[in-house]
Every structure is written in C-alpha cells, then in structure tokens.
Amino acid sequence: MYKRQIIISPDLAFRAEATTGEGSIWHPDRNTLFWVDIEGKTLYEYIPDLQNCRSWQFDRMVSTVVPETDSTVVVALQNEIIRVNLTDGNTTSIASIPDNNGKIRCNDGKCDPSGRLWIGTMGFGAPKGAASLYCVWADGTVETKLTKVTISNGIVWSANKKYMYYNDTPTRKIIRFRYDDSSGDILYDGVAVNIPEGTGSPDGMTIDCNDNLWVAQWGGGGVYCYNPYTGDLLTKIVVPAPHVASCAFGGDKLDTLYITTARAGLSEEQLEEYPLSGSVFCCKPGAKGVPANCFH
C-alpha cells in the first residue's frame, strides 16, 4: 500500500476560519479558485495574484460551486441549485433538490464531461442511508442516481469518460462506476480504493491528468493520492489541520493543488494545536490536474 510514497507539506494560501471549507474548484475562464464555507453560508473566490478573496453571502447553507461562464457560477444551496451572476450578485433558480422536510441538505458535487451537475446530499446528523445522489440537467431536470447514501462526497470522471469515481464518506471506500457520457447512466464496477486505517475518511476529491485520485481525508490531516487501478497510496500531503475537506488543481498550468480545511468538530485544544484549521493551503505535488467541467 505504501509503495513509492511521497510526503509533501503545503504552504498557507489564504488564512481563514471557515467552519467547513469545502467545494474547491478552479474556474477555467477566470483563473481563480472558488470554494465555500458550508455553515458560514458563504461563497468565496480566491484570487491568487491578490492573495485575497471576494465573497457572496446566502440565506442558506452552501456546499458546492461549479463554473458556468466567465461571469456566472452554479451553486448548491441547502435544497436548491442556483445560478449566481458574479458581476451583480443576482441569482436565478435552476432546480430544487429533495430535502425531506428540511432533514436533508446538499453536499458535494461536480459537473460531468457533458455539463450535467451531479450533486449529493446528506442528512443533518448524518443518519445512515438517508441521502441520495442526483444529476441535474441544464433544463432543470433532476434525476435520482443513487439512494441509501449517508454522506455523498468526492465525485470525478476518468479522462476517457468511461469511469466515474465516488465516495460515501462513512464507508471509507472509493467506488468505481462504469459511466456513459451520452446518457449519464452509471453501473457499479467495484471498489477502487480502500482508505487505509488511521487516515480518516474520504471527503472531497479531484483527479489528475494521469487519472490518479487526490482525496481530502476528514480526520486524516491530509490529502492522499491513490492509483485507482491498483489502490496503491502514492503521495500524502500533510496538512496542518485534522479535518481536510476538499482539493482542486489550479494555476496557469493546473499544477498547484489547493486544499480547504475545517474547524467544525474540533475541540478548543485541537484548535490551539492547529490554529490554521479553516484556511486554504496550496502546494505543487508534481502532478497536473484537468480543467473543471462547466455546467451547460
């Protein structure tokens, strides 16, 4: 499992105190990093040249952001998918997501190669099997893809568009599905990675140009890179925060990995030991990402 393992320490990109910093994604048209603070109900745009963030506040939790155009993004609020105009802040509704009378909220999501938004959910308190995975089309149609999920997370697609990788956090496994890009149909194809004991649980995830999976591990203090064909752990990025929630490749060459973290669930003692929890980190791990898919 630990063949050729490389260990890397990241730099601090932007100091923040996000309760749960999540949903990191590099906007290919704006060359900036978008991310969210779920409980803070805030969308952020990190501008590397300025080393600062713009922000947009919402009236509900916000968990996912994906690019659409150079002036718009699509955001998952607690129970709704909306379009946000980044110039004037105006929003329009795209689709509603079932919330079981306020017991369920949106969690992680990304667009597939054909521009459909896949958005997963979780229950408040994370009751087992209460959540689902949905696919949202540009016309607002919502398809149910998976049910009996607990905490839907980490979804990416292979370069050849034949496989989708996904995790339900408490299972501590990354699942591979056969994927049909024209229809969006998926078929279970086995376990790609079993998360090693003592390294936390899989949260957000991104994929590099060689199809290796970079997985933010909640409670694992790092981002872990796996070969999805062998399950081998290749690289560990040791982050100075126990709860690592998401990661995304960015920068002009897509060779910088940005990492978001959380303060949620940490004791006062842990926050004293890890004061940068809730911040955004970055490093160049020797791999290149792939451009984010836009909603269309």
Which residues fall in each region the model found?
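Conserved small/polar residues in nucleotide/adenosyl-binding loops
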Residues: 1-5
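A short beta-strand motif characteristic of beta-propeller blades
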Residues: 9-15, 51-57, 92-99, 141-147, ...
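Beta-rich, blade/repeat-based domains predominating
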Residues: 16-30, 58-74, 100-116, 145-163, ...
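Conserved beta-strand positions in repeat-built beta-propeller and related beta-rich domains
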Residues: 27-28, 33-38, 74-79, 119-127, ...
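A short loop-to-beta-strand structural motif that recurs across blades of beta-propeller domains
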Residues: 42-44, 80-82, 131-134, 173-175, ...
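Hydrophobic alpha-helical segments and helix pairs
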Residues: 90-147
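Loop/turn-rich, solvent-exposed surfaces of beta-rich toroidal or solenoidal domains
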Residues: 173, 177, 194-230
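Short loop/turn segments immediately following beta-strands, especially the blade-tip
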Residues: 177-185, 285-290
